[in-house]
Amino acid sequence: MAAPVVSGLSRQVRSFSTSVARPFAKLVRPPIQIYGVEGRYATALYSAASKQNKLDQVEKELLRVAQLLKEPKLAASILNPHVKRAIKVKSIGDLTAREKLSPITTNLINLLAENGRLNNTPGIISAFSTMMSVHRGEVPCTVTTASALPEATLSELKTVLQSFLSKNQVLKLEVKTDPSIMGGMIVRIGEKYVDMSARTKIQKLSKAMREAM
C-alpha cells in the first residue's frame, strides 16, 4: 500500500526540481545524500538552486522561513493539522509575497502546502543546511568540557583540530560545557568521537578494579 505514496512523492519532487529550471537538465546531486521525505525535497531544492547559481540565496531564504515558523501565530495557522489546506495555501501565498522570496523557494513552500507536507518544512530546511555545510567543506566539531576554556587554550585547541583537516576543509566548532564529565574533554569531529573526560576514565578504572577482584 505504501508504494503508490512513495511513487507519488517521487513524481512531485522530480516535478519541482524541473519546474523552476529550464531547459530540463540532469539532477544536480548534493554533496551528501539524505534519506526520507525531507531528503528528497532538499535534494530537489539543491538541484534546482544549483542550476540557477542561487544556492546561497535559497539558503538565506530558508533560514528566514525557519525563523518565521517559530512565530506562534504563523505556526498555529499553517502547521496545525486541523486547519484546512486551502487556508494554509492562502497563508503561505501571503507569506512568500510579503517576504519577496525567490521563485525557487516560493515553489517549494507552495508545493509543500498543496501536498499537505508543511510539517516537513523544518526537516527539509535542516537537510538543506546540512547539504550546504558539506558543500562549503565545513566539518562539524563539538568539544565538551566541564567548565569554560580560557581563550588561549581554546585558540590552541582550534589549531590542533584544524590540523586534522585537509586543506579545503573548514572547521565548524561548537564548544559546550557539562560539569558532569568532571574534567578533561569529549571531542566529536566529523564521524570521529574521542572521550577523554575524567568521568569516563573513572568509570573505566572502576570497571577494571571490579574485574580484577
Curated annotation (Swiss-Prot):
PTM annotation (N6-succinyllysine): residues: 90, 100, 158
Q: Which segment is the transit peptide?
A: 1-23
Reported modifications of this chain: In response to mitochondrial stress, the precursor protein is ubiquitinated by the SIFI complex in the cytoplasm before mitochondrial import, leading to its degradation. Within the SIFI complex, UBR4 initiates ubiquitin chain that are further elongated or branched by KCMF1.
Keywords linked to the UniProt accession: Acetylation, ATP synthesis, Hydrogen ion transport, Ion transport, Membrane, Mitochondrion, Mitochondrion inner membrane, Transit peptide, Transport, Ubl conjugation
Name the GO cellular-component terms: mitochondrial inner membrane; proton-transporting ATP synthase complex
Q: Which Pfam families match?
A: OSCP
* Superkingdom as given in the UniProt entry: Eukaryota
Indicate where this protein is primarily found.
Answer: mitochondrion
Q: Which residues carry this modification: N6-acetyllysine?
A: 54, 60, 70, 73, 100, 158, 172, 176, 192
Compartments, record wording: Mitochondrion; Mitochondrion inner membrane
Q: Name one GO molecular function term.
A: proton-transporting ATP synthase activity, rotational mechanism
Has keyword Disulfide bond?
no
Motif SIFI-degron mapped to chain: 5-23
Which family, according to UniProt? Belongs to the ATPase delta chain family.
PANTHER family xrefs: ATP SYNTHASE DELTA CHAIN
Q: How does it assemble?
A: Component of the ATP synthase complex composed at least of ATP5F1A/subunit alpha, ATP5F1B/subunit beta, ATP5MC1/subunit c (homooctomer), MT-ATP6/subunit a, MT-ATP8/subunit 8, ATP5ME/subunit e, ATP5MF/subunit f, ATP5MG/subunit g, ATP5MK/subunit k, ATP5MJ/subunit j, ATP5F1C/subunit gamma, ATP5F1D/subunit delta, ATP5F1E/subunit epsilon, ATP5PF/subunit F6, ATP5PB/subunit b, ATP5PD/subunit d, ATP5PO/subunit OSCP.
Its function? Subunit OSCP, of the mitochondrial membrane ATP synthase complex (F(1)F(0) ATP synthase or Complex V) that produces ATP from ADP in the presence of a proton gradient across the membrane which is generated by electron transport complexes of the respiratory chain. ATP synthase complex consist of a soluble F(1) head domain - the catalytic core - and a membrane F(1) domain - the membrane proton channel. These two domains are linked by a central stalk rotating inside the F(1) region and a stationary peripheral stalk.
Protein's name according to its UniProt entry: ATP synthase peripheral stalk subunit OSCP, mitochondrial
Q: Coding gene?
A: ATP5PO
